[in-house]
């Protein structure tokens, strides 16, 4: 089979760090290839043959957006994910309500469209988190609904410069995450995943064992729900592949977004010694995240590959319809 030429394409929303674009954007050569020849099998075959180049690009930039390729369905997206050859990571221990779609593909966080999902590294609050994640736009929103991304080491450096004592405390004590789960999923909440979905079982004994495997403490509540305590776990990690520290946590997400009828966000995350976080510094971190982020409006067929070690992501509110799918990789 012929191989497709991959073209690095500039878009207005990109930022540049050390002369490298963020995110990198890859498109087909629009002028040289007739549209009928631009098939999904050709795209997936090119991914396989150009894997070294794409891995290098992801390592340099932290995120790669594939735009203009014939990825028209969840099945197509699953084929794209499979073409990269990354091992699958089951979604066990995460907070977001999600629905399995096909193969390795499930819905992105299904919280209501008027709610913002704050910046976080995917599953930063558990031991086993994905190293990479894919997003795919099946239905582009009428308005809003971007998935802003931000380079984690940039956030770390800015926080260290502005709040050195706070960062030192984080490095010494880590963070403690507390979440109260219902028995079943609550689609009205951005963290509404019930314990049955969280641990992929209806058996409490098995749920307890899986919690232990994840490093969680699990307590059952009188209403049939559960309380999970995770940590202390590091809030700042060292990215060995890039030789730099990264702001690898869900601090802002938990403190500003883990709120529903069961959860108080101010109690959802604390220093690892249990002491409360200073609200003004948390909100200043949010400001830094917003200043440094890139928000590219989704287009139907877009596939976004994120290095979860390098990049935090979020979701902006939107006017429906919008359907963005996801896949996690070890």
Curated annotation (Swiss-Prot):
Keywords: Acetylation, Iron, Metal-binding, Oxidoreductase. Pfam families: TauD. It comes from the Eukaryota. One of its GO terms (cellular component) is cytosol. Its cofactor is Fe cation. One of its GO terms (molecular function) is metal ion binding. InterPro entries: AlphaKG_dependent_hydroxylases, TauD-like_sf, TauD/TfdA-like. The modification N-acetylalanine is found at residue 2. May use 2-oxoglutarate as a cosubstrate. This is Clavaminate synthase-like protein At3g21360.
């Amino acid at each position: 089979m012929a191989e497709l030429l991959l073209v690095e394409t500039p878009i207005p929303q990109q930022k540049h760090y050390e002369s490298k674009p963020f995110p990198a954007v890859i498109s087909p050569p629009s002028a040289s290839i007739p549209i009928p020849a631009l098939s999904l099998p050709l795209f997936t075959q090119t991914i396989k043959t150009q894997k070294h180049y794409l891995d290098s690009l992801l390592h340099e930039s932290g995120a790669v957006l594939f735009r203009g390729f014939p990825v028209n369905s969840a099945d197509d997206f699953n084929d794209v994910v499979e073409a990269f050859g990354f091992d699958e990571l089951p979604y066990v221990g995460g907070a977001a309500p999600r629905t399995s779609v096909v193969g390795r593909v499930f819905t992105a966080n299904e919280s209501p469209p008027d709610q913002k999902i704050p910046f976080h590294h995917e599953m930063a609050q558990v031991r086993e988190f994905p190293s990479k994640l894919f997003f795919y736009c099946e239905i582009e929103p009428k308005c809003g609904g971007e998935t802003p991304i931000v380079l984690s080491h940039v956030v770390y450096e800015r926080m260290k410069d502005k709040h050195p004592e706070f960062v030192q405390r984080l490095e010494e004590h880590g963070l403690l995450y507390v979440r109260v789960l219902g028995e079943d999923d609550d689609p009205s909440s951005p963290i509404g995943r019930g314990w049955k979905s969280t641990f992929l079982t209806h058996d409490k004994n098995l749920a307890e064992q899986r919690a232990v495997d994840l490093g969680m403490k699990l307590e059952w509540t009188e209403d049939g729900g559960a309380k999970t305590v995770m940590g202390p776990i590091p809030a700042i990690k060292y990215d060995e592949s890039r030789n730099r520290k990264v702001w690898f946590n869900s601090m802002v997400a938990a403190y500003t977004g883990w709120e529903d009828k069961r959860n108080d966000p101010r109690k959802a995350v604390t220093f690892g010694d249990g002491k409360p976080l200073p609200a003004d510094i948390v909100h200043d971190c949010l400001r830094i995240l917003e200043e440094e982020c890139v928000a590219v409006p989704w287009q139907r067929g877009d596939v976004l590959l994120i290095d979860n070690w390098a990049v935090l992501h979020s979701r902006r509110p939107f006017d429906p319809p919008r359907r963005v799918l996801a896949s996690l990789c070890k």
